[in-house]
């Protein structure tokens, strides 16, 4: 993507502006070759020898569309028309890269996505367990820096519990979600934006509304559309948590209250926590999370159960049912 951007997108017009038509032509044809290779990479295929690139591209529907756009670039039209054709192809690629989960937005200048592409490529060989572990460690580092009005919270020193709670959730996610969230969190953290701090701040809209009014300007504003999506997701997950609570009351009794109306200044409900967390997600991450929730709904499964299953196994139980039975016995003694 960066090579296509540096040759056809950037240096082609730059060389033309200098009056160097020979180098401009070289940049354009280099860019065409890089575009053919990029289409192969997007499809998860290794590009063949240069002489077979075009034919190989045309084996897929997306490749055929890219080839048509490349034909426009190579048609030998006026420089302005060629530059417009290059931008049209760049827009096509940004859409394909976004759709496949490689990038978080559709900025058509492809070099703008280099950092994200390199970061996600470096995560490619890691297992889901390793990705979940890396996210939890980065979050705990960020959590350590959160300043509480009442002083440092004891849970900020409890890596064991924090690790289990976070990984239990992340191990229900797919690789695309894990890579996206890890990239988002890493990027924001190294820009000085602590998503854990933002999450707890957003929760205060319910638990400490007066304080929230003082701090809300520090958080990115959520669009009406994003708020609506979050509320749809929250509604589904609260329903699933209610269902889980009915079936496994002993386990649920050791977790958070479920509903926002149960919030106090000291206790934050599952609903409020979830709403705060989703409010920190990037547009791309929320899109992926929404698909994940839809998939659960379509399959008639419950993410609350799967998350709790991961959690109790990390605590040494065989299953949710085993944990429920043993905890109920202890409570009865």
Predicted regions and their residues:
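Long amphipathic all-alpha helical oligomerization modules
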Residues: 64-80, 115-124, 268, 273-323
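A cross-kingdom feature marking solvent-exposed beta-strand/loop segments within repeated
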Residues: 149-173, 179-184, 195-197, 262, ...
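Repeat-associated, polar segments at repeat-unit boundaries in modular proteins
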Residues: 178, 183-223, 293-323, 327
């Amino acid at each position: 993507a960066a090579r296509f951007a540096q040759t056809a997108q950037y240096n082609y017009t730059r060389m033309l502006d200098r009056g160097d038509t020979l180098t401009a032509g070289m940049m354009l044809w280099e860019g065409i070759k890089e575009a053919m290779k990029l289409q192969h990479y997007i499809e998860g295929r290794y590009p063949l020898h240069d002489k077979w690139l075009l034919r190989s591209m045309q084996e897929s529907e997306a490749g055929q569309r890219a080839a048509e756009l490349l034909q426009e670039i190579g048609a030998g039209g006026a420089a302005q028309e060629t530059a417009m054709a290059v931008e049209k192809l760049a827009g096509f690629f940004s859409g394909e890269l976004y759709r496949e989960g490689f990038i978080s937005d559709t900025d058509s200048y492809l070099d703008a996505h280099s950092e994200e592409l390199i970061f996600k490529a470096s995560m490619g060989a890691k297992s889901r367990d390793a990705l979940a572990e890396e996210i939890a460690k980065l979050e705990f580092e960020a959590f350590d820096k959160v300043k509480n009005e009442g002083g440092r919270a004891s849970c900020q020193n409890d890596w064991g519990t924090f690790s289990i709670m976070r990984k239990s959730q992340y191990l229900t996610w797919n690789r695309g979600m894990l890579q996206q969230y890890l990239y988002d969190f890493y990027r924001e953290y190294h820009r000085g934006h602590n998503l854990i701090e933002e999450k707890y701040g957003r929760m205060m809209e319910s638990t400490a509304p007066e304080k929230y009014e003082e701090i809300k300007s520090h958080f990115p504003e959520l669009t009406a559309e994003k708020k609506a999506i979050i509320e749809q997701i929250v509604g589904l997950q609260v329903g699933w948590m209610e269902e889980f609570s009915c079936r496994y009351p002993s386990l649920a009794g050791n977790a958070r209250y479920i509903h926002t109306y149960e919030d106090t200044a000291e206790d934050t409900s599952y609903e409020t926590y979830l709403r705060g967390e989703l409010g920190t997600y990037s547009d791309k991450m929320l899109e992926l999370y929404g698909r994940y929730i839809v998939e659960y709904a379509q399959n008639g499964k419950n993410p609350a159960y799967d998350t709790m299953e991961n959690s109790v196994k990390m605590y040494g139980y065989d299953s949710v049912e085993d944990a429920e039975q043993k905890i109920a016995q202890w409570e009865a003694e």
